[in-house]
């Protein structure tokens, strides 16, 4: 078991080497991009097609990874770029803040307000460490959340089908708010999360990574 991480690193390296050979034959570059499930739900999914269109000649590998795994892969140089809520504090990595993501209180119940928001089938979504600390100060429910998840999409689907309330990024619920399927509970406090990118400072594809970071930043401007 102790050798398993080392074996996984070797396999990942071999797989990437095979892809690199194929890319070299076709004169393409490859960039691997990873985000946590919540990053994909709340941010990356809305711009991945624009990124692909803006980088012709680049083969993009997009993956869902937990934060700790992304950090490890960056340090092993088997991942080029990670998009994260809680950036790693590692000297070998370049970390940049690219945007701020508004997270708002929404409910399937039109009568939801600050007095009953947390007691009416409240779904807790883990939006990272900073959010957890903020949430601990704001929570005034009389019982624990009736459902917990680390994925915003699961929370959204649940409250749409079964009713309830949750803190969800505004970008993810805009259509439901316009359609009247969800309601913004405006007298409940809202928050936001900073989104960061990280890559190895010695990455040989830094110019391409910088272009990708610029595209991600522009994605926030467009949204």
For the regions a protein language model found, what residue spans apply to each?
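Secondary-structure junction motif
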Residues: 118-146, 152
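Short beta-strand->loop
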Residues: 94-104, 179-192
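Hydrophobic hinge/microswitch elements
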Residues: 66-67, 140-185, 190
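Central regulatory/effector-binding core of bacterial HTH transcription factors
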Residues: 28-90
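A late-sequence structural motif
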Residues: 187-223
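Acidic, Gly/Pro-rich loop/turn segments at junctions of secondary structure
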Residues: 65-120, 129-134
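Alpha-helical "hinge/linker" immediately C-terminal to small N-terminal DNA-binding modules
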Residues: 1-23
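Short amphipathic alpha-helical coupling segments at ligand-binding clamshell hinges
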Residues: 2-6, 43, 118-120, 204-218
């Amino acid at each position: 078991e102790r050798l398993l991480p080392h074996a996984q690193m070797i396999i990942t390296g071999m797989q990437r080497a095979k892809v690199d050979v194929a890319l070299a034959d076709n004169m393409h570059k490859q960039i691997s991009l990873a985000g946590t499930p919540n990053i994909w739900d709340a941010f990356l999914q809305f711009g991945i097609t624009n990124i692909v269109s803006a980088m012709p000649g680049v083969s993009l590998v997009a993956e869902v990874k937990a934060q700790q795994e992304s950090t490890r892969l960056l340090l092993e140089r088997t991942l080029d770029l990670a998009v994260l809520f809680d950036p790693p504090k590692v000297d070998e990595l370049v970390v940049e803040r690219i945007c701020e993501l508004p997270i708002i209180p929404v409910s399937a119940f039109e009568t939801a307000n600050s007095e009953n928001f947390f007691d009416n089938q409240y779904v807790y979504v883990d939006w990272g460490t900073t959010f957890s600390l903020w949430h601990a100060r704001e929570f005034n429910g009389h019982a624990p959340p009736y459902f917990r998840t680390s994925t915003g999409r699961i929370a959204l689907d649940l409250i749409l089908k079964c009713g309830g309330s949750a803190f969800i990024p505004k970008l993810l619920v805009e259509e439901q708010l316009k359609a009247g399927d969800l309601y913004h509970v405006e007298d409940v406090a809202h928050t936001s999360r900073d989104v960061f990118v990280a890559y190895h400072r010695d990455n040989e594809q830094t110019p391409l990574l910088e272009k990708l970071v610029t595209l991600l930043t522009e994605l926030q401007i467009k949204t």
